[in-house]
Curated annotation (Swiss-Prot):
Phenotype seen when the gene is deleted: Does not affect the production of fumivalines and fumicicolins.
GO MF terms held by the record: N-acetyltransferase activity
Organism of origin: Aspergillus fumigatus (strain ATCC MYA-4609 / CBS 101355 / FGSC A1100 / Af293) (Neosartorya fumigata)
Physiological role: Probable alcohol acetyltransferase; part of the crm gene cluster that mediates the biosynthesis of a yet unidentified copper-responsive metabolite. In contrast to crmA, is not involved in the biosynthesis of fumivalines or fumicicolins.
The protein's annotated pathway: Secondary metabolite biosynthesis
Sequence similarity: Belongs to the alcohol acetyltransferase FCK4 family.
Domain of life of the organism encoding this protein: Eukaryota
Enzyme class: transferase
Keywords: Transferase
Keyword Cytoplasm found: no
Pfam families: AATase (PF07247)
Protein name: Probable alcohol acetyltransferase crmB
Amino acid sequence: MSKGKLEQVSAACHHLGFFNNAGLSAHYKLSESSSPAVADLRGLVYAAAGDLLRKHRILFAIPVNEGTPNPHFACLPWIDLRRSIAFLERSVPLASAAEEQDKELDAILEEQHNIDFQTDYGTLPFWRLIILRSKGRNDFTASFIYHHAIGDGVSGLAFHKAFCNALEAASSSTLPTDRAENIIRPDENTVVLPPLEELHPMPISPRQPPLPTASPKEWTGASIHLPCKSRWASLYISPSASNAFVQECKEMKLSVTSALSSVVAAVLFDNLPSRVEALTCIIPVSVRPWLKLPPQVIDNAIGTYFDALRVRLTRAEQRSQDPSPVGIWCGARQVSRSINAYLCDVSPSGEPYTSVAAFKTVPDVSAVFRSTLGKPRDAAFEVTNVGLFPPAAIRRPSRWKAGNVLLSRSAAVPGAAVTVSVVTGRDGTMALGFSWQEGVVEDGFMHRVRQGVWKYFEKYQS
């Protein structure tokens, strides 16, 4: 199975130790109207995972020849769930949204994001599932950790949407879960979806990029270097505060992503020396709306289908029109204009021009990434917002409720100094995750940034 350029980029970064994996965690709780407890959670998870795997062939795929100019996918003949799913038990009760952070889950995620998929290569899939069970038998958190060539951030939502449905089906089944299979083979009637190049024309803009102008003093953290140790911390915004923030964004006619990007920029400016005049932000953009696939396939696809844009935010512009301690709306409008310009800059065939199209002209992406070592990075921060975990398609009483969700990832060696990953759960809680590379920014600095973001949202708390 051939790889597209986005998959090749992820494969090269994994091979070089530049990026290990992404993750999406979701908390599941048995409804009070259901049976009092789950007697065999392991069997139930195995049954749900087996059902899901048979529907998503990509989860059997492993990258081959990652460090070469022509990597490709091979398909495992089977997956042993006993080796790919780990069961842990919480040592302390699950933190509530009011407590801002799930430190126990954060520690697990940080460990997972520092573990690649090289061990037992050829026998294990390039994903793993961590089940963190609360004391008692009625709720758990499932963390899906996966290679970026297998899926993007939206794919994490697709996985949990499928897992939630499979969990419900397994709970409703009359078959005993203690007989659930642990060896899962792919359904030969399923296929790996094509790469981006086969579903999108990936047009390259005929316009030349603007000539460089005098650059203000920017901050991008320490230069690009190895080795990479990823650091991680989460922040949960309550449903009431999240809803109030979203409503204010709507009143301002701005997207949540635009506003969040400006919040992070404002907090960074507040924690950086006054001589820092500008910050560049990377914003990933899903290109799924323009893929040549039926909507129902796109919505449930696990694959790599995204692009990214950049916007420069300046301290002067942010402060000149908004003198409040953390003024964000001027910056949010600037981000919004950049997003709209990206979406409106369309090719003759109707799709926006993509920045990832430039990789089509690169024969060996590994060489490109190796050449970045020792050089300054080109962005201060990235904000990835995958939106809302979609509600169940069938509105009927269900045994399992999916609540908090959390998007997470390794630090990217050649990427932005700070990455903020955002997702909103079915319960309305908006979760922000902060990842950074040790040695690129200090832990104390990131603690202040996280606290600054939390302080901004305090005004929305009811």
